[in-house]
């Protein structure tokens, strides 16, 4: 832990020495932005929205062999406590308003993971009259995990890709430049 603190202090010191005086606020804000994103990637609290067999693979990802807790991913039961929702399985027309309601109850910033071919595009039931052809028609999706059902390794990889995406965001810097 001390090594990480020393590395961070050296990185900050080198950034301040290289920055021209008029860009110093942008350097400070971008470093704060990076620190906030680092904290968000290390404490991702998803809400599981398991609708079919993909939810079983999602549960396996939280079990002892893959242990998503070591990545800081701890599932929550309430949408008000979570910052990510994992849609796993076949989304029907009757379930779509419930998904939208749960998504709207989540605080910002919020992220969506679509897990399995049924959640991605309807899957095996694509031509059924009662199936939504992809949950991205209801809510915006950040990461798609393919497969029928996707393996637990694919689930872990999808969560790691979401963490990379969160680490690249520049929310404060975009706000500052407005």
UniProtKB/Swiss-Prot annotation:
Q: Which organism is it from?
A: Dictyostelium discoideum
The gene coding this protein? ndufs7
Q: Does the keyword Oxidoreductase apply?
A: yes
Gene3D superfamilies noted in UniProt: 3.40.50.12280
Q: Which family does it belong to?
A: Belongs to the complex I 20 kDa subunit family.
Keywords, comma-separated and alphabetical: 4Fe-4S, Electron transport, Iron, Iron-sulfur, Metal-binding, Mitochondrion, NAD, Oxidoreductase, Respiratory chain, Transit peptide, Transport, Ubiquinone
Indicate what this protein is called per its UniProt record. NADH dehydrogenase [ubiquinone] iron-sulfur protein 7, mitochondrial
Instruction: Please provide the Gene Ontology terms (biological process) for this protein.
Output: aerobic respiration; electron transport coupled proton transport; mitochondrial respiratory chain complex I assembly
Subunit composition?
Answer: Complex I is composed of 45 different subunits This is a component of the iron-sulfur (IP) fragment of the enzyme.
The record, for Pfam families, names: Oxidored_q6 (PF01058)
Q: Where is [4Fe-4S] cluster annotated to bind?
A: 53-54, 118, 148
Q: Which Gene Ontology CC terms are recorded?
A: mitochondrion; respiratory chain complex I
Lineage, uppermost ranks: Eukaryota, Amoebozoa, Evosea, Eumycetozoa, Dictyostelia
Task: Give the protein's function.
Answer: Core subunit of the mitochondrial membrane respiratory chain NADH dehydrogenase (Complex I) that is believed to belong to the minimal assembly required for catalysis. Complex I functions in the transfer of electrons from NADH to the respiratory chain. The immediate electron acceptor for the enzyme is believed to be ubiquinone.
For this protein, the record's InterPro entries field holds: NADH_UbQ_OxRdtase-like_20kDa, NADH_UQ_OxRdtase_20Kd_su
């Amino acid at each position: 832990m001390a090594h990480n603190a020393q590395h961070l202090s050296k990185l900050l010191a080198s950034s301040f020495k290289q920055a021209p005086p008029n860009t110093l606020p942008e350097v400070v804000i971008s470093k704060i932005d990076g620190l906030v994103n680092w904290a968000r990637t290390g404490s991702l609290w998803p809400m599981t929205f398991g609708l079919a067999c993909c939810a079983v693979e999602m549960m396996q990802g939280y079990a002892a062999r893959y242990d998503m807790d070591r990545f800081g991913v701890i599932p929550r039961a309430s949408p008000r406590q979570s910052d990510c929702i994992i849609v796993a399985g076949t989304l029907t027309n009757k379930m779509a308003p419930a998904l939208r309601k749960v998504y709207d109850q989540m605080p910002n910033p919020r992220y969506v993971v679509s897990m399995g071919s049924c959640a991605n595009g309807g899957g095996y039931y694509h031509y059924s009259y009662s199936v939504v052809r992809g949950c991205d028609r209801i809510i915006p999706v950040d990461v798609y995990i393919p497969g029928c059902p996707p393996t637990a390794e694919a689930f872990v990889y999808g969560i790691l890709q979401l963490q990379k995406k969160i680490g690249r965001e520049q929310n404060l810097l975009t706000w500052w430049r407005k």
